[in-house]
């Protein structure tokens, strides 16, 4: 879990950071529809399943932007060298979910090895956090594959210094000749503005339009 201390003093967003961290601590969410038409077609001849592929692509996009890898450590702002996805797994028998994490790798084959290893070990464990303590360097990914939504928001009480992005996918649906996936991104306003979330979403769309390798 390597990281770099961030130079807040000379940051162009210093005023924004301090205002939304101390004077008006808040977050916001933004929902957009990701076109997954090309991605789904490419998976027809692949051994990879859609959900872990989306976890991989989301993690890949998040890891390209400093503002999505920021955290407070020892009361200082830092940027993790990389963040690992923490994702939800639904248990049909109990109608509950667990949150699992696996090491991120930019190589999709290695990432899938990591993902499958975690799933094989913990997929039947119904505790909320089967692996115990969540890694400090993480992002959050979950899915609601039962419903298509236009917006999604987590109402967080007593908003504090939790800067990890929270990304939620809905049920995808056909619209004309396109397959669209609603995706909600929730962030802390101290480290992210609408511009940064839009940049992440646009990058994720580019990744979904590209070949996996």
Curated annotation (Swiss-Prot):
Record gene name: cat3
InterPro entries on file: CAT-like_dom_sf, Chloramphenicol_AcTrfase_AS, Cmp_AcTrfase
Annotated SMART domains: CAT
Record Gene3D superfamilies: Chloramphenicol acetyltransferase-like domain
EC number from the UniProt entry: 2.3.1.28
Disulphide connectivity of cysteines: none
TM region positions: none
General function of this protein: This enzyme is an effector of chloramphenicol resistance in bacteria.
One GO-annotated biological process of the protein: response to antibiotic
Organism this protein belongs to: Escherichia coli
Protein name per the record: Chloramphenicol acetyltransferase 3
Keyword RNA-binding: no
Uppermost EC category: transferase
Catalytic activity entry: chloramphenicol + acetyl-CoA = chloramphenicol 3-acetate + CoA
Recorded family membership: Belongs to the chloramphenicol acetyltransferase family.
Keyword list, A-Z: Acyltransferase, Antibiotic resistance, Plasmid, Transferase
MF terms (GO), sorted A to Z: chloramphenicol O-acetyltransferase activity
Tagged with keyword Transferase: yes
Subunit structure, as described in the record: Homotrimer.
Active site: 189
Domain of life: Bacteria
């Amino acid at each position: 879990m390597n990281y770099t201390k961030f130079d807040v003093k000379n940051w162009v967003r210093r005023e924004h950071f301090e205002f939304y961290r101390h004077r008006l601590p808040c977050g916001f969410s933004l929902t957009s529809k990701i076109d997954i038409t090309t991605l789904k077609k490419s998976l027809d001849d692949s051994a990879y399943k859609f959900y872990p592929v989306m976890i991989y692509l989301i993690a890949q996009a998040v890891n390209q932007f400093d503002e999505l890898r920021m955290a407070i450590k020892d009361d200082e702002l830092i940027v993790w060298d990389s963040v690992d996805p923490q994702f939800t797994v639904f248990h049909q028998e109990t109608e509950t979910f667990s949150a699992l994490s696996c090491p991120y790798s930019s190589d999709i084959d290695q990432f899938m090895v990591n993902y499958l290893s975690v799933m094989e070990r913990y997929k039947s464990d119904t505790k909320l956090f089967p692996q115990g303590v969540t890694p400090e360097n993480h992002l959050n990914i979950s899915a609601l594959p039962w419903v298509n939504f236009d917006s999604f928001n987590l109402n967080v009480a007593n908003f504090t210094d939790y800067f990890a992005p929270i990304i939620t996918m809905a049920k995808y649906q056909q619209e004309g000749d396109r397959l669209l996936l609603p995706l909600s991104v929730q962030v802390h306003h101290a480290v992210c503005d609408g511009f940064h979330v839009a940049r992440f979403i646009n990058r994720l769309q580019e990744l979904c339009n590209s070949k996996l390798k």
